Amino acid sequence: MLSPYGKGTLVTSLLISLLLAGAGLIFPGIVQAVFSTASVGLALFALFFFRDPSRTVPSEPNAVLAPADGRVLLIKKIAHPFTGQNSTLVSIFMSPFNVHVNRIPLQGRIAHLSYSPGKHLMAFNHASMADNERMEIGLENSQCRIIFSQVAGFIARRIVCSLRVGDNVAAGSRFGMITFGSRLDIVVPESTRLTVSKGCKTVAGETVIGYVK
């Protein structure tokens, strides 16, 4: 399955691929081989990049799911106005080779959305959390409030978020993507029992990163 969030970019890439293939037919020999290789390479890269595999979402209602594929880059205690004092930040680094579609970590209602333009520092630079372009999303339900942020990086400079304030969302459902990877930060309340540690691999919509008490 291919992600609908990158449909425009995917179509453009495939059209360029066809143009390269057509140009290759005009020139004989090595030039033709170069154009043909570039055409196939671009098409395969576009299909690989915008892949959107199905996921088996855990049925546990108090489970907080990973919102992104990648690896846990950072875990630390912070204070956040939406989640309160002694909240826990979990940062997930998404490489260009990960699936880039983001998923909702917990069932609830979207109570807050805030887009901030900014820099494009490397995603593994922790200053990127505050300084980089990002979309901050606040979710609440009867148990808790959580906040998660799509953070653009040095390569990833396009954030896609389909959410609106007031939307009711299901855990594990798709809500957007960050093109070419980067990072996704999630802040959970103090009462959350984490089940991941730094370096753990995460799969969006499947990996349980913690349980809300």
Swiss-Prot record:
The family database entries (InterPro entries) matched by this protein are listed as: PS_Dcarbxylase (IPR003817), PSD-A (IPR033175)
Q: Name one GO biological process term.
A: phosphatidylethanolamine biosynthetic process
Top-rank EC class of the record's enzyme? lyase
Q: Which reaction equations make up its catalytic activity?
A: a 1,2-diacyl-sn-glycero-3-phospho-L-serine + H(+) = a 1,2-diacyl-sn-glycero-3-phosphoethanolamine + CO2
Q: Which UniProt keywords apply?
A: Cell membrane, Decarboxylase, Lipid biosynthesis, Lipid metabolism, Lyase, Membrane, Phospholipid biosynthesis, Phospholipid metabolism, Pyruvate, Zymogen
UniProt-annotated location(s): Cell membrane
Q: How is it modified after translation?
A: Is synthesized initially as an inactive proenzyme. Formation of the active enzyme involves a self-maturation process in which the active site pyruvoyl group is generated from an internal serine residue via an autocatalytic post-translational modification. Two non-identical subunits are generated from the proenzyme in this reaction, and the pyruvate is formed at the N-terminus of the alpha chain, which is derived from the carboxyl end of the proenzyme.
Question: Where in the sequence is the active site?
Answer: S182
Keyword Lipid metabolism among record annotations: yes
E.C. designation(s): 4.1.1.65
Keyword Ribonucleoprotein part of the UniProt annotation: no
Q: Which residues carry this modification: Pyruvic acid (Ser)?
A: S182
What domain of life is recorded for the organism?
Bacteria
The UniProt entry lists membrane topology as: Peripheral membrane protein
The annotation note on the cofactor reads: Binds 1 pyruvoyl group covalently per subunit.
> NCBIfam families recorded for this chain?
PRK05305.1-2 (NF003678), PRK05305.2-2 (NF003682), PRK05305.2-5 (NF003685)
Quaternary state and partners of this protein?
Heterodimer of a large membrane-associated beta subunit and a small pyruvoyl-containing alpha subunit.
Family in the record:
Belongs to the phosphatidylserine decarboxylase family. PSD-A subfamily.
Q: Which PANTHER family match?
A: ARCHAETIDYLSERINE DECARBOXYLASE PROENZYME-RELATED (PTHR35809:SF1)
According to its UniProt entry, the function of this protein is described as:
Catalyzes the formation of phosphatidylethanolamine (PtdEtn) from phosphatidylserine (PtdSer).
Identify this protein by name.
Phosphatidylserine decarboxylase proenzyme
Q: Which gene encodes it?
A: psd
